[in-house]
Amino acid sequence: MSIQIPRGTQDILPGTVELWQYIEGQAREICRRYNYKEIRTPIFEHTELFLRGVGDTTDIVQKEMYSFQDRGERSLTLRPEGTAPVVRSYVENKMFGDATQPTKLYYIGQMFRYERPQAGRYRQFVQFGIEAIGSNDPAIDAEVIALAVEFYRGMGLKNIKVVLNSLGDAASRQAHRDALIAHFEPRIGEFCSDCQSRLEKNPLRILDCKKDRNHELMGTAPSITEYLNEDSAVYYDKVQELLTMMDVPFEKDPNLVRGLDYYQHTVFEIMSEAEGFGAITTLSGGGRYNGLVQEIGGPEMPGIGFAMSIERLIMALKAENIELPIEHSIDCYVVALGEKAKDHAAKVAFDLRKAGLAVEKDYLDRKMKAQFKSADRLKAKFVAVLGEDELDKGIINLKDMATGEQEEVALDVFASYVAEKLI
C-alpha cells in the first residue's frame, strides 16, 4: 500500500511551483519598494508564545494548533500565524533599539492549523505577511493597507474590496466590552458553548462566531463605533482620509472584529468579489496590535501588520482568469548523436550553464527525433546538435527554434556565442 499525502496538505509540483515563485518574487519586490526587510523565524515555537500572543479564547489556540512535547518535555507548537513569532524575535533581538524606527519586516512561510480542509483552506498553508512595529502614526496603517492593495492590483486582480473597522483603544474596547456583556448575558444560554465561555473572557469574539451568526442578538449587538472615544474616532477618521488620498477604496463594517485577541484600533480585510471564487471570500486581513509587544515581554511599542494566503490568491487569479507572465522555457537543448558525441555534449552543456544559460541534454540515448521532441516540450529557444561529423569539423549545428534558422558555430566559442544571442 502506497503512502499518501496527509489530509489538508498539497504537493506543489514543477509546472505549478513556478507560479508560486513568481508570486513570492513580486511580494519581495513590493516590500523592497516600501522598505520592508525579510525576517525568517522558526517553524515551531514555544506554545506559550501563542497562548499569550494570539489569545487563549481564539479558535486558533483552542482548536487548531499542532502542539507536541519534545524529548525535554517542552510544549512546542507549529506556528499557526506569523505575527507572534515576528514580535517574539523583535523583542528577543532588541530590534526596538535600532536607530531606524519603525521596524518594518516581512515574511513568507508555512503555517499550520488543524482545520477542516476545503477550497482555499489547508492544514499547511503559506502566508505572506508584513509587520511595522514602533509607530502610532495613522499613516502607517494606511501604508500597510495600500501595500496589500497594490500587491493584488499588481497581480492583475480587479474584483477586490477593502473592508475597514476600528476596535478603538483600550478604553474604547472596555466600554464596548461592558456593553456586549450586558447585551448577551440575559440570553447567553441560547448560544454555543464557545460563545458562553467567551462572554466574560472576550465577548467581542462572540460576534465572530460562525455557529450563531444568524441569532437575532447578533444583528442588534452594540457596535464598537458607538463606543469609540474622541482619540479613537479621530484616529479612525485619519486612516480613512489617508486611504482616500492614496486612491484605496474601502467599505466600513462595524461588525468586522478579526479572529485574534491582540487587535486594537484599525482592523481590515481584503476580499474577492470574483464570481466563482467560493464561500471563503477573505484573501487577507490584519490590523493594529498596540499591546502585543508588551504581552510578549518587550517595551510598550505599537505595531500593525497583515497576512495573506498565497493559496487564496491563486484561487482569486483563477477566478478572474488571470495568466501571470511566467517563463517555462530553457535557453538551449543539446542533442548528441553517437557515442563519440555524448561526452562532448556533456561538456558543451556544462560550458553553456557556466555562461549563465538554462540548459538540458539527453540522458536516455534517445534518437534525434525524440530528443527534438524533448526540446519542444521544454520550450527550448535553441537546439545544439552535436554528432561525429560536427566533432570532426570542430563545429556545432545551432537551430533557432522560433525562426527555424540554422547555422554552424565553432565549438571553442559556442557557449559565448549563444550567450550573446540571448542577451
UniProtKB/Swiss-Prot annotation:
**Could you tell me where this protein is found in the cell?**
Cytoplasm
Class of this enzyme: ligase
- InterPro entries per the UniProt record, alphabetical: aa-tRNA-synth_II, aa-tRNA-synth_II/BPL/LPL, Anticodon-bd, Anticodon-bd_dom_sf, His-tRNA-ligase, HisRS-like_core, HisRS/HisZ, HisRS_anticodon
Family matches, as PROSITE patterns: AA_TRNA_LIGASE_II (PS50862)
For this UniProt record, give its keywords in alphabetical order, as a comma-separated list: Aminoacyl-tRNA synthetase, ATP-binding, Cytoplasm, Ligase, Nucleotide-binding, Protein biosynthesis
Q: What is its EC number?
A: 6.1.1.21
Subcellular location, principal: cytoplasm
Listed under catalytic activity are:
tRNA(His) + L-histidine + ATP = L-histidyl-tRNA(His) + AMP + diphosphate + H(+)
Entry GO CC = cytoplasm
As one GO molecular function, the record gives: catalytic activity, acting on a protein
The UniProt entry's GO biological process terms, in alphabetical order, are: histidyl-tRNA aminoacylation
Subunit organization: Homodimer.
Q: Into which family does the record put it?
A: Belongs to the class-II aminoacyl-tRNA synthetase family.
Protein name (database record): Histidine--tRNA ligase 2
Q: Give the lineage.
A: Bacteria, Bacillati, Bacillota, Bacilli, Bacillales
Q: Which gene encodes it?
A: hisS-2
